[in-house]
Swiss-Prot record:
One of its GO terms (cellular component) is extracellular region. Residues 29-70 have a biased composition (Low complexity). Keywords: Disulfide bond, Glycoprotein, Repeat, Secreted. This is Intestinal mucin-like protein. It comes from the Eukaryota. InterPro entries: Cys_knot_C, Cystine-knot_cytokine, Glyco_hormone_CN, Mucin_vWF_Thrombospondin_sf, Ser_inhib-like_sf, VWF/SSPO/ZAN-like_Cys-rich_dom, VWF_dom, VWF_type-D. CDD domains: TIL. Multimeric. Its main location: secreted. Pfam families: C8, Cys_knot, VWD. It is found in: Secreted.
Length: 837
């Protein structure tokens, strides 16, 4: 076999001599070639090829060539091939290099492999072999969750889990895809915080993070974010697509064959086995077509309880500080399980629909047990929330994938109704990709989903346009459907809907040409504005702008003001000076009733009367009235430059209780007749009369210490004095007394001591010293101590404070000193004393 110039195989046949030194020639029979694909797990079965007849043998015969130890390969091929090397040609044809450019052609024929049983209860799917010739069965990795929430793993294991954190649904054990993972954000959705519901489905793929969030539950409202930004659907970027399919929001990664959907109540994840088999971890299990290893921990350990394992698949979520983070060594808080069904639980009749004849056609394809049990659970523990509808909805969705369409919502008495927009109708089994005018036959038209679809007889215009049209014409930026050939106006353009091309063609609207206008009147200008009868066209007119008027406002005299008058039909005002109705005096204006200063001896006022000659108001004046009498202590005196005499104070006036007054001349002192210790005085300082009331403070006086009959008044007539009785002397001692201590606004009354009493103090003449001899001692503290007291503050608090407490008193000697005046008198009297001697 050789390759021709036009890349065609040329087959040559001839007989080769039989000699021991040459290899045996190929016979024109087709060698048997078969290929068997052995599945690595029970989830795949492969087709097998059957032998076919070889098409050629080749080529040269060299009987004279001596025997060779190594057979030459097919060196004439590009690239050169070695002996027994195989390569694919086309149409499932394989070439085998036999020796020395001899090539064997083998055609593969595939036998259908036996259909395996998938542990998740779904039908296996046909998957092409890597060679593209044969195919094999695989059980797709399909995980779903719904309600509060209930899970069915990739391998079909059912369990419920009530965590309210963010968890890993699926990640790769050994990463083969950059940053791939699916995560679920749960929250407590009942009043007792015992059950949880899904809130956000999160999909990671390479550089993108997709969040499908439930923003409102009844009715369900969902939004989609990509990398924390809201996006419109359909969205397609970097190998990832997000679109709405019925009531579901789908994240599709075509390169991986991965699909993730979420509708606010349930989610599903479908992954191809040949890419993700034996390589998944998380709450969705391991995808091995074996439920025994689904309850796997992040450490790789397999346990028997999936609820316990699910609690370990936490995702660090800063928005949920109550959730433990990865790497914590402390014991995780136990998940609160709802416990057994309450005795008073009334099961919703919606759940019985799953087991009734309504779904009987689906029972052979999808076992209903798990969905029925989940529905009972939700109707008891989240009663009245409509959560039981999620179980029926999830089961009906799987039935639709198996081709069994069930319109079940009409049998729930409105408990699970779906509300559609006015321009759409609910269908239990519509196309997963709704047909549009641009694509009438979507690639997944055989898949069925429930949702809100365009009514019969209408078609969705295009992806991203929520517009249903009867005739596939055009939809412009106003979202109004148009028929082909229809003319319409939009954005001041004349548009037409055309078949083909961009669809809508628009041209600027043509307006009638108006007459040019010139504006000659003062203050007017030309303006172009929208025509009130046709907003797309303009009209020209003259408008008035007072700021453009050239006539200046006149300057008016005092007492007059400018008046502007608008004449009908004129743009600019007419100005004139009119009286303001005021008085004018010395270049100042006065309002009627206001005083007008003329001179000191007149009181003038502006009147309402107008002088017809000047058109100004008249000023009326009267002489200023003068005082003719003054109150006590004051006298009328002449004031230079004033019209009237002024009352000037000449005496001090002291007001006493009971409306009594004492009048004193400057320098006069008067005692209070009712109180010997109080006297009044009047002084003149810097021409100001200052009165004062003085009180004499007397020293302590105890009549019991006096010689009887010796009590007299001091010269001031206020204080008493007497001859001291020496027999009543009290010795120096510590005397207790109640006294208030205050500090920083806080105070308290406490008992403290003070020193008082008589000590041996004397003064006598000394003949030896020829002077007075003094002996002085004071009653002073002998021992003291520092004590603490708790003061009461106005705000109710306490303040600790220290003070000195006198423990005992003692007479202590001191130097006797006389006042300065007495010392002077003593010095003056000394000579007389010396003289007497």
């Amino acid at each position: 076999v050789n390759c021709s110039v036009d890349c065609q195989l040329q087959v040559f046949n001839w007989s080769c001599p039989s000699t021991p030194s040459t290899p045996p020639p190929s016979t024109p029979t087709t060698p048997t070639s078969s290929q068997t694909t052995t599945p690595s797990t029970p989830s795949t079965t492969s087709s097998k090829s059957t032998p076919s007849t070889p098409q050629s043998t080749s080529s040269k015969s060299t009987p004279s060539t001596p025997p060779k130890t190594t057979l030459p390969g097919c060196l004439d091929f590009d690239p050169p091939r070695q002996v027994n090397e195989t390569w694919w040609l086309c149409n499932c044809t394989m070439a085998i290099c036999k020796y020395d450019n001899v090539v064997e052609i083998v055609e593969l024929e595939c036998n259908p492999p036996p259909m395996p049983t998938c542990s998740n209860g779904l039908k296996p799917v046909r998957v092409p072999d890597p060679d593209g010739c044969c195919w094999h069965w695989e059980c797709d990795c399909y995980c779903t969750g719904w309600g509060d929430p209930h899970f069915v793993t990739f391998d079909g294991l059912y369990y419920s889990y009530q965590g309210n954190c963010t968890y890993v649904l699926v990640e790769e054990i050994t990463p083969t895809v950059d940053n791939f993972g699916v995560y679920i954000d749960n929250y407590h959705c009942d009043a007792n915080d015992k059950v949880s519901c899904p809130r956000t489905l999160i999909v990671h793929h390479e550089t993108q993070e997709v969040l499908i969030k439930t923003v409102h539950m009844m009715p369900i409202e969902v939004e989609v974010q990509v990398n924390k930004q809201l996006v419109a659907l359909p969205y397609k970027k970097y190998g990832l697509e997000v679109y709405q399919s019925g009531i579901n929001f789908v994240v599709d990664i075509p390169r991986l064959g991965a699909q993730v959907s979420y509708n606010g109540l349930s989610f599903s994840i479908r992954l191809p086995y040949h890419l993700f088999g034996n390589n998944t971890k998380g709450q969705c299990g391991t995808c091995t077509n074996n439920t025994a290893d689904d309850c796997i921990l992040p450490s790789g350990e397999i346990i028997s309880n999936c609820e316990v394992a699910a609690d370990e698949w936490l995702v660090n979520d800063p928005s949920k500080p109550h959730c433990p983070h990865k790497g914590l060594t402390t014991k995780r808080p136990a998940i609160t399980t709802p416990g057994p069904f309450p005795e008073n639980c009334t099961v919703s009749p919606v759940c019985q629909l799953i087991m009734d004849s309504l779904f009987s056609q689906c029972h052979p394809f999808v076992p209903p047990k798990h969905y029925y049990e989940a529905c009972l659970f939700d109707s008891c523990f989240v009663a009245g929330s409509g959560m039981e509808c999620a179980s029926v909805q999830a089961y009906a969705a799987l039935c639709a994938q198996e081709g069994v369409c069930i319109d079940w919502r009409n049998h729930t008495q409105g408990a699970c109704a779906v509300t559609c927009p006015a321009h759409r109708q609910y269908q239990a089994c519509g196309p997963s990709e709704e047909p549009t005018c641009q694509s009438s036959s979507p690639k997944n038209s055989t898949l069925l989903v429930e949702g809100c679809f365009c009514p019969e007889g209408t078609t969705k215009f295009a992806p991203g346009y929520d517009v249903c049209v009867k005739i596939c014409g055009c939809v412009g930026p106003d979202n109004v459907p148009r028929e082909f050939g229809e003319h319409f106006e939009f954005d001041c353009k004349d548009c037409v809907c055309l078949e083909g091309g961009s669809g809508i063609v628009c041209q600027p609207k043509k307006c009638a040409r108006g007459n040019l206008t010139t504006c000659e009147e003062d203050g007017t200008y030309l303006v172009v504005e929208a025509d009130p009868d046709d907003k797309c066209c303009n009209t020209t007119s003259c408008k008035c702008d007072p700021k453009r008027c050239k006539a200046e406002r006149p300057s008016c005299l005092l007492g007059f003001e400018v008046k502007s008058e608008h004449v009908p039909g004129k743009c600019c005002p007419v100005y004139s000076c009119v009286p303001k109705g005021v008085c004018v005096h010395e270049n100042a204006e006065y309002q009627p009733g206001s005083p007008v200063y003329s001179n000191k001896c007149q009181d003038c006022v502006c009147t309402d009367s107008m002088d017809n000659s000047t058109q100004l108001n008249v000023i009326s004046c009267t002489h200023v009235p003068c005082n003719i009498s003054c109150s006590s202590g004051f006298e009328l005196v002449e004031v230079p430059g004033e019209c009237c005499k002024k009352c000037q104070q000449t005496h001090c006036i002291i007001k006493r209780p009971e409306q009594q007054y004492i009048i004193l001349k400057p320098g006069e002192i008067q005692k209070n007749p009712n109180d010997r210790c109080t006297f009044f005085s009047c002084m003149k300082i810097n021409n100001q009369l200052i009165s004062s009331v003085s009180n004499i403070t007397c020293p302590d006086f105890d009549p019991s210490d006096c010689v009887p009959g010796s009590i007299t008044y001091m010269p001031n007539g206020c204080c008493k004095t007497c001859i001291h009785n020496p027999n009543n002397t009290v010795p120096c001692s510590a005397i207790p007394v109640m006294k208030e201590i205050s500090y920083n606004g806080c105070a308290k009354n406490i008992s403290m001591n003070f020193c008082a009493g008589s000590c041996g103090t004397f003064a006598m003449y000394s003949a030896q010293a020829q002077d007075l001899d003094h002996g002085c001692s004071c009653c002073r503290e002998e021992r003291t101590s520092v004590r603490m007291v708790s003061l009461d503050c106005p705000d109710g608090s306490k303040l600790s404070h220290s003070y000195t407490h006198i423990e005992s008193c003692l007479c202590q000697g001191t130097v006797c000193e006389l006042p300065q005046a007495q010392q002077s008198r003593t010095r003056r009297s000394s000579p007389r004393l010396l003289g007497r001697k």
